[in-house]
Amino acid sequence: MKALDQLTFDNRFARLGDAFSTQVLPEPIADPRLVVASESAMALLDLDPAQAELPVFAELFSGHKLWEEADPRAMVYSGHQFGSYNPRLGDGRGLLLAEVLNDAGEHWDLHLKGAGQTPYSRMGDGRAVLRSSIREFLASEALHALGIATSRALCVIGSSTPVWRETRESAAMLTRLAQSHVRFGHFEYFYYTKQPEQQRVLIDHVLEQHYPECREAEQPYLAMFRTIVERNAELIARWQAYGFCHGVMNTDNMSILGITFDFGPYAFLDDFDANFICNHSDDRGRYSYANQVPIAHWNLSALAQALTTVIEVEPLKEALGLFLPLYQAHYLDLMRRRLGLTTAEDDDMVLVERLLQCMQRGGVDYSLFFRKLGEQPVAEALKVARDDFIDLAGFDAWGADYLARCGREPGNAEGRRERMHAVNPLYVLRNYLAQKAIEAAEAGDYSEVRRLHQVLARPFEEQPGMQAYAERPPEWGKHLEISCSS
């Protein structure tokens, strides 16, 4: 493992030139102090976890110091926000500090969020508050532990720097890791500003660095777009299967890598509600849980439009047509596994849909239902789960069909509990748990943030003394809508 001064840098995106980003130095925050760090994220950089305890760690990730090899850049892009095109967005408070090359040959972006004003700040102060920084840290690491593709969070650094949102809060910086920070909106920017040469440079960069397997295809650009469609189909299937609501699926928040990116007012479902809206600014429900599948397809079509400079329209349409069937296949596979099924039958999707309809009628905690279902033999588990349902007749009918379906599985029930527990988390990042940790951190106590992070790092394993993190939320903690304010 390495010390901070032993990291290797290779700033590929910065070398593309000033048409793609602007060099900006971070603005330091006062009295930097470590709030929380992720050892598993540090390992991606080959970084010794003990480095997080050194004063220089907080200084480097709060803008006070820079590596000599760093080339901090604010990236320019545009995007569709709530369906309307915004011609110039860009990194308004974040900087791509550098790209680290690890010993495995992987490049990882170091992105500092809350680093101060940039040419793209759009009247903002360029800061991030402690509250939103902790939320992104927890979500990144929780999703990773669930097996959902996501950007990673290296650390959160707190400060005494005041910032004003609805009230006075303290500034913080979050260091995000991803193998690229290129968004759908990057391609939209060069398309709508009619810069075809820069557009092609960017496409070639993404193809070369992130989709090298597509270079030998007969149509490399089309092969790359098809792979992006495939990755997003799997990503959204995992969101839906695990009840994750992103909240702000604007095209500038969509990663070209097909990973969860740019967290805002996200939430995991508590009681199942297909129409749940986690963002209180989303008054029309554009980004509700139920709409995430069609919105992902819409966003991919926006990307396809931006790529018409290098790919013919009809092949793009054909590639877009892959999204829904791929999504459905991934989603059904995940839901079969969550139900403990190891084989496929034609009516399995109907079985899943009937279960969700029963849940929708009220009273059922989405995550805990699946965990309970695997605790005991099927008949006994159904009796226990029944108590949570309002639609008892509907659940009884479903339960009878599910019991019969399980009876057609090959072999016996040996290993069913282990199989189901391996895919059904006991611990989920619920907004009320995050809020309690944030309130403690705002009072200067970071222990709850760190404890919650450690629990969520092993979501499928029962952890002694951590039962409180596996309980149903209190009524006040359910279906919290979160502000975009950050």
From Swiss-Prot:
Pfam families: SelO (PF02696). Keywords: ATP-binding, Magnesium, Manganese, Metal-binding, Nucleotide-binding, Nucleotidyltransferase, Transferase. It catalyses: L-seryl-[protein] + ATP = 3-O-(5'-adenylyl)-L-seryl-[protein] + diphosphate; L-threonyl-[protein] + ATP = 3-O-(5'-adenylyl)-L-threonyl-[protein] + diphosphate; L-tyrosyl-[protein] + ATP = O-(5'-adenylyl)-L-tyrosyl-[protein] + diphosphate; L-histidyl-[protein] + UTP = N(tele)-(5'-uridylyl)-L-histidyl-[protein] + diphosphate. It is an enzyme of class 2 (transferase). The gene is ydiU. Its EC number is 2.7.7.-, 2.7.7.108. ATP binds at residues 90, 92-93, 113, 125-126, 176, 183, 262. GO terms for molecular function: AMPylase activity; ATP binding; magnesium ion binding. PANTHER family: PROTEIN ADENYLYLTRANSFERASE SELO, MITOCHONDRIAL (PTHR32057:SF14). This is Protein nucleotidyltransferase YdiU. Its cofactor is Mg(2+); Mn(2+). Belongs to the SELO family. It comes from Pseudomonas putida (strain ATCC 47054 / DSM 6125 / CFBP 8728 / NCIMB 11950 / KT2440). Mg(2+) binds at residues 253, 262.
